[in-house]
């Protein structure tokens, strides 16, 4: 692969290869060395999990790592991001992990600069978060092998979620049996890539093998959508009661950060069915697999 931009651009075989390579790294702890490769992390949005996970993945692969401090960079003087990348590429940096609030920015950069650099999308606006989809699927297949037999439910603000967009795509590519998108009507997407939409929490969770909770974006609640937290919690939170509609061994997942007591109760987030910390662990190995697939291409 030249770039890693969105799941829809990958074949099912490429995705399967990334999943298996991530699990190989996790179980063997045998990491190749790519010490001649230099990578820069450019995060124009706040991040804990994704940023640190990518950096750990890079260091496990013995890459030389540059973390750009946007507060002290020429970006504060108005430098365009493409000029920043051209400048860093002239210094010998080949790989760029980028998170940005603008939908499609990484694709545009790849179109303009793709002959000389490799672009990795660490999240663009509400559009895509492909590495999250890979790590989520690594977490699922580690426990539940037959994807075509699974019912997976995504719960929350589907409309504004890059996580939900990328996960729909990966479920379609890998032939997941059933995907249900559970959301209040005001947060339901105008376009569904894969699966079906419902505003009935209990029906959506009925018999689910995997439940993925999405963060309630409080800033959108207050400014745009006029949906109050009490309504959401009473009708869409993942509690012990609502979890009981799923299968007894259902996996509970969340991309983080969590709003405990809003979209998910602590008893569920910390309970025996929770795989949230496994997602965090697997994120490092998934991103190692992604980076390795770009090196030498």
From Swiss-Prot:
Reactions this protein catalyses: carbamoyl phosphate + L-aspartate = N-carbamoyl-L-aspartate + phosphate + H(+)
Broad enzyme group: transferase
Protein EC: 2.1.3.2
Pathway linked to the protein: Pyrimidine metabolism; UMP biosynthesis via de novo pathway; (S)-dihydroorotate from bicarbonate: step 2/3
Domain of life of the native organism: Bacteria
Any one GO MF annotation of this record: amino acid binding
A Pfam family per the record: OTCace_N
Record keywords: Pyrimidine biosynthesis, Transferase
Residues bound to carbamoyl phosphate: 49-50, 99, 129, 132, 256-257
Cellular component aspect of the GO annotation: cytosol
Cystine crosslinks: none
Positions of L-aspartate binding: 77, 162, 215
Listed NCBIfam families: asp_carb_tr, PRK00856.1
Stored PANTHER family: ASPARTATE CARBAMOYLTRANSFERASE, ORNITHINE CARBAMOYLTRANSFERASE, MITOCHONDRIAL
Homology family: Belongs to the aspartate/ornithine carbamoyltransferase superfamily. ATCase family.
Protein name in the entry: Aspartate carbamoyltransferase catalytic subunit
Organism of provenance: Legionella pneumophila (strain Corby)
């Amino acid at each position: 692969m030249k770039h890693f931009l969105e799941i829809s651009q990958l074949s099912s075989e490429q995705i399967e290869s990334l999943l298996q390579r991530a699990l190989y790294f996790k179980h063997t702890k045998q990491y190749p060395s790519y010490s001649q490769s230099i990578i820069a992390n450019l995060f124009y949005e706040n991040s804990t999990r994704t940023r640190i996970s990518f950096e750990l993945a890079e260091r496990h692969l013995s890459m030389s790592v540059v973390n750009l401090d946007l507060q002290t960079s020429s970006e504060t003087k108005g430098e365009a991001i493409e000029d920043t990348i051209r400048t860093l590429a002239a210094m010998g940096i080949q790989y760029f992990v980028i998170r940005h609030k603008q939908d499609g920015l990484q694709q545009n950069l790849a179109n303009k600069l793709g002959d000389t650099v490799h672009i990795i999308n660490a999240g663009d606006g509400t559009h895509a978060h492909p590495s999250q989809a890979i790590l989520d699927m690594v977490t699922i297949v580690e426990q539940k092998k037959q994807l075509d037999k699974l019912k997976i439910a995504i719960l929350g603000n589907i409309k504004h979620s890059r996580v939900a967009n990328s996960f729909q795509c990966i479920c379609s590519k890998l032939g997941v049996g059933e995907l249900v998108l559970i959301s209040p009507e005001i947060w339901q997407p105008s376009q569904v890539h894969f699966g079906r939409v419902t505003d009935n929490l209990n029906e959506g969770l009925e018999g689910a093998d995997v439940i993925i909770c999405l963060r309630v974006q409080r800033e959108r609640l207050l400014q745009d959508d006029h949906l109050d937290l009490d309504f959401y919690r009473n009708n869409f939170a993942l509690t012990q009661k609502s979890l009981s509609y799923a299968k007894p061994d259902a996996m509970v997942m969340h991309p983080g950060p969590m709003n405990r007591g809003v979209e998910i109760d602590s008893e569920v987030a910390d309970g025996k069915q929770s795989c949230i910390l496994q997602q965090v662990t697997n994120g490092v190995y998934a991103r190692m697999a992604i980076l390795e697939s770009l090196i030498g291409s």
